[in-house]
């Protein structure tokens, strides 16, 4: 049984620079007169977006070739971006960008939009335009199944334990570390996979992340984490 120690709902949206509108952005493709919608993804955040070697998905659909890196991108957000591009009559271009710098690229005009689990915050709202939310997710704390924390059901039980906490760099998850009493700030990582690996290797005691991401990213969530 997985313990949902942090039960907080946040929303995810498409994000564009305030200097651009989705219907007004884009450039002409070099191969056709069709306009291009450039969207950046982390491409390492399953099930929302990930990288694979071939375009084959297995459901009759096709993954999208990544413009600035090897491989193809697919996932819920990639499919959603493709539908938006299709509705606008644009060609979709996918860019693979590390999370820690993805919003900076949006600001400098490297691409038109970001769709990679970006959550609304008042601070981000000062710089970026957010679409209507397309997903609500639950933030949880995940620990090793064989750790002393595995049977905890309340955050108050962590008081005085000096629990080492990790999450993704520069995300809205970071402030939730303060919700764990007596938590010790451990190293944060670029990807969710690295966060889970830190818990598996006992470099950290708990990762704070999205519950759905846990189901897809944890090496073996049913057996190893709670």
What are these regions (language model features)?
Residues 188-190, 197-203:
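Extracellular/periplasmic Venus flytrap/periplasmic-binding protein
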Residues 34-118:
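Extracytoplasmic small-molecule ligand-binding "clamshell" domains
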Residues 43-46, 70-86, 118, 140-192, ...:
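Bilobed "Venus flytrap"/periplasmic-binding protein-like clamshell domains
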Residues 90-91, 108-116, 163-164, 201-210:
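Alpha-to-beta junction loops
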Residues 82, 91-158:
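Acidic, polar ligand-binding/catalytic clefts
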Residues 216-226:
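Single conserved hydrophobic/aromatic residue that forms the stacking wall/gate
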Residues 1-36:
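Short, low-complexity disordered leader/linker segments with a strong preference
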Residues 103-104, 123-125, 151-152, 174-178, ...:
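Extracytoplasmic/secreted cell-surface and envelope-processing proteins
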């Amino acid at each position: 049984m997985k313990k949902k120690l942090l039960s907080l709902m946040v929303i995810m949206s498409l994000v564009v620079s305030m200097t651009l509108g989705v219907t007004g952005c884009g450039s002409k493709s070099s191969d056709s007169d069709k306009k291009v919608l450039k969207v950046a993804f982390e491409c390492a955040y399953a099930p929302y977006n990930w990288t694979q070697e071939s375009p084959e998905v297995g459901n009759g659909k096709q993954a999208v070739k990544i413009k600035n890196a090897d491989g193809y991108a697919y996932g819920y957000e990639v499919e959603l971006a493709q539908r938006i591009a299709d509705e606008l009559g644009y060609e979709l271009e996918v860019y693979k960008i590390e999370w820690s710098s993805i919003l900076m690229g949006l600001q400098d005009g490297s691409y038109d939009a970001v769709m990679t689990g970006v959550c609304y915050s008042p601070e981000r709202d000062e710089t970026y335009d957010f679409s209507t939310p397309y997903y609500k997710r639950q933030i949880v704390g995940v620990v090793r199944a064989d750790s002393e924390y595995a049977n905890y059901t309340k955050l108050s039980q962590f008081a005085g334990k000096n629990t080492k906490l990790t999450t993704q760099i520069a995300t809205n998850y970071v402030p939730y570390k303060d919700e764990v009493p007596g938590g010790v700030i451990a190293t944060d990582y670029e990807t969710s996979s690295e966060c889970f690996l830190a818990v598996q290797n006992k470099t950290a005691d708990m990762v704070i992340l999205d519950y759905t991401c846990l189901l897809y990213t944890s090496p073996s969530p049913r057996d190893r984490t709670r």
